[in-house]
Design a protein with these regions (language model features):
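Phosphate-binding loop of NTP-binding sites
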Residues: 88-235, 239-247, 302, 311, ...
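Acidic, Mg2+-coordinating active-site environments of NTP-dependent enzymes
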Residues: 9, 68-75, 169, 184, ...
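A short acidic, helix-capping loop that chelates divalent metal ions and anchors anionic groups
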Residues: 74, 141-146, 203-209, 379, ...
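Short internal beta-strands
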Residues: 59, 63-69, 231-235, 372-373, ...
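Short secondary-structure boundary segments
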Residues: 67-70, 178, 200, 235, ...
Length: 487
């Protein structure tokens, strides 16, 4: 595709230099990659400025640049834009012939519940006869085909490449997790969502957004900027009233405590699942028997149901889709251990999520509730003592250990968590090495105990000092049990 054709729809275009007829055959955001006839995107980030790597990108095959300032030391065509990230999204869409215009999109945003809700939306829409795709934290899916991804919402190059593959595979509906980072970084600029879903807002990502207000405003923009055509909104969330006041698009509310268009009644929670009546304001209702437990999964089911109903899916297909889903990777996932105690894997890595999983497990714990968790490095430090306090209040024993320390000192992170747990009477131990911590949990587990491994969930790595090393807790648990049994 000619460069001029590629950039003609970019609203951020200011000026061009050089031969705009040059053919572009690839997209590049990593100057170290060999990219023949590629276009390299330059913009200033939080930690580096890609403009300084433009010569390396050209040396590796790029024949054009998108820049936020002209570079005099690089002799290739340059496209000057006012916002490099936003321009990147639009150019990626054009390069792949606009896959975002060829499918229906459901975007789920919120601090918690995005992954499970997206899986539920996919399941419901498949029951309705649609071929579905999924984009999210656990990776992307085309039907049952899994495509690994390192971000909740991928960068535009990867996102549009995967969406184009979905189009080629005949996908009709895509359930997508929409992170606040993706919104703020313009990764989704140019996309339109038939339905946007707001799940909730609680403390997370303050290392990036600074304040909860900034975090909320970023989420709200998804519903007020024209990106979403319809909205499904959790009426029970404390920021719902403010969101509803400013949202002008058609919307459906859902909830349990608050008055809502879609709500759950007669909720019964067991260790094996949840049953409830899903009711509409017109008095129509359907009985739902989820095979996933926890009150938070009632909310996830409500959010998915609201999205599906907005898409025009029948209540019966909503029921069938919700009841057919057994589990979501790393979300209150019961591991097969063949032990007198149970081991549960969960992605909980923020205060509310930790509270939810521990409260849920407490309802069906016969003996002790043992919580193993840490906090990620280079992320919101304010939540560390809060999570320590939550663990100390809700678990019988906390095992504090490393999550993904990244570039921070693991013991310093643990000391900050410890500050919170010391405010409680909860029993705890500190074992920095996560594998050793899991071994300790398995060694002390007794009949009737529940051990909850929090924080990693579906992840198959641990990041320490900037290096990601293989660490799949499902595998680690099985390896340790084999060792402990002397097999």
């Amino acid at each position: 595709m000619e460069l001029r054709q590629l950039v003609k729809e970019v609203p951020y275009l200011m000026e061009t230099r050089g031969n705009m007829s040059v053919e572009i055959a690839a997209l590049c955001s990593n100057s170290r990659e060999k990219t023949e006839n590629g276009i390299f995107f330059c913009f200033a980030g939080a930690h580096f400025d890609a403009h300084q790597y433009a010569p390396q990108a050209v040396q590796n095959g790029c024949v054009a640049l998108v820049v936020e300032r002209f570079l005099d030391d690089v002799n290739v065509p340059q496209v000057l834009v006012s916002n490099g990230r936003a321009a990147m999204a639009r150019i990626c869409e054009a390069f792949f012939d606009h896959p975002e215009r060829k499918m229906r999109f459901v975007g789920i945003t919120g601090t918690k519940g995005k992954t499970t809700t997206s899986y539920m939306v996919k399941s419901i829409c498949e029951q309705a006869g649609f071929k579905c795709g999924l984009v999210g934290t656990t990776g992307n899916m085309i039907g049952e085909k899994h495509i690994p991804s390192s971000k909740t919402t991928p960068d535009p190059i990867d996102l549009m490449r995967d969406l184009n593959e979905m189009v080629q595979a005949g996908v009709q509906v895509v359930a997508m997790e929409v992170s606040a980072h993706a919104l703020d970084m313009h990764r989704l600029d140019g996309m339109t969502f038939e339905c946007g879903c707001y799940t909730n807002l609680s403390q997370d990502h303050l290392d990036y957004f600074g304040t909860m207000e900034n975090y909320f405003q970023c989420k709200k923009a998804f519903f007020t900027s024209g990106m979403a055509k319809n909205a499904a909104i959790n009426a029970d969330d404390e920021r719902a009233a403010e969101l509803l006041r400013d949202v002008t698009i058609p919307h459906m509310t859902y909830g349990i405590a608050a008055e809502a268009d879609l709500f759950a009644r007669d909720i019964e929670i067991t260790e094996n699942g949840v049953s409830f009546e899903l009711r509409l304001r017109n008095a129509e209702y359907i009985q739902i028997n989820l095979r996933m437990t926890g009150m938070f999964n009632v909310y996830n089911a409500l959010s998915a149901a609201a999205c599906a109903l907005i898409l025009g899916v029948s209540p019966e297909n909503v029921r069938a889709g919700l009841e057919s889903i057994r589990s979501v990777p790393g979300r209150i996932e019961m591991l097969p251990t063949n032990t007198p105690y149970r081991v549960i894997l969960d992605y909980a890595h923020a205060p509310d999520a930790l509270s939810n999983i521990l409260r849920t497990c407490r309802t069906f714990t016969k003996k002790r509730l043992i919580a193993l968790f840490g906090c990620g490095g280079d992320r919101d430090k304010g939540k560390r003592p809060i999570m320590g306090r939550i663990g100390g209040e809700l678990a019988d024993l906390c095992i504090l250990t490393s999550d993904n320390p990244r570039t921070e000192d693991p013991m310093e992170i643990l000391r900050e968590i410890e500050e919170g747990i010391k405010e409680t009477t909860g029993e705890y131990v500190v074992i920095e090495n996560r594998r050793d911590a899991i071994r300790h949990a398995l060694e002390i587990g007794r009949e009737g105990d529940i051990i909850v491994l929090c924080g990693k969930g579906h992840e198959t790595y641990q990041e320490t000092m900037g290096v990601k090393r293989p660490f799949d807790e499902k595998v680690v648990v099985q390896e340790l049990l084999t060792e402990l049994r002397g097999e």
